[in-house]
């Protein structure tokens, strides 16, 4: 495994946040995820230890808005960090993507949907509860898109 960034800061014109997040993801990958990856794949095991590390690093809340206590990263910053994680543990990168997409669906993407005031308030209240669970307790979310009959 290489220990240099796949996204060279100057060539990619990374923002400070993008640089910090990719560095953080690479550090976790090198020091924690890489050694566990083969076991997770061989044993078809969920990478729970890696999720504990992601939670400790604040990365479970990468796309949770800052006003809720998250890192408030945009999609590009998230994608760059995910690519770094994928270099070290595919299972973690794949499942983390599902988790982050759940945050995006309930966050910025949902904000663009038409909702009446009552529904929007209920959505915001519910989303705040889920964000707190992620940030405080390390809750992991995903959506059932690949299961038969689950999507419209």
Whereabouts are the PLM-identified features?
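N-terminal flexible segment immediately upstream of the FAD-binding catalytic core
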Residues: 1-5, 47-52
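Onset of an N-terminal alpha helix
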Residues: 15-22, 26
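N-terminal capping segment at the start of a domain
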Residues: 28-38
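A generic secondary-structure micro-motif detector
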Residues: 39-41, 71
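Active-site beta-strand/loop signature of hydrolases that rely on acidic residues for catalysis
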Residues: 43, 58
């Amino acid at each position: 495994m290489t220990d240099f960034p796949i996204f060279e800061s100057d060539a990619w014109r990374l923002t400070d946040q993008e640089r910090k997040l990719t560095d953080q993801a690479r550090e976790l990958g090198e020091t924690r995820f890489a050694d566990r990856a083969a076991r997770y794949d061989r044993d078809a095991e969920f990478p729970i230890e890696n999720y504990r590390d992601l939670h400790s690093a604040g990365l479970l809340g990468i796309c949770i808005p800052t006003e809720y206590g998250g890192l408030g990263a945009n999609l590009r910053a998230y994608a760059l960090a995910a690519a770094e994680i994928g270099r070290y543990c595919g299972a973690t990168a794949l499942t983390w993507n599902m988790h982050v997409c759940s945050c995006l669906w309930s966050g910025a993407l949902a904000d663009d949907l038409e909702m009446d005031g009552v529904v929007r308030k209920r959505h915001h209240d519910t989303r705040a509860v889920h964000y707190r669970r992620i940030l405080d307790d390390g809750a992991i979310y995903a959506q059932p898109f690949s299961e038969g009959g689950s999507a419209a």
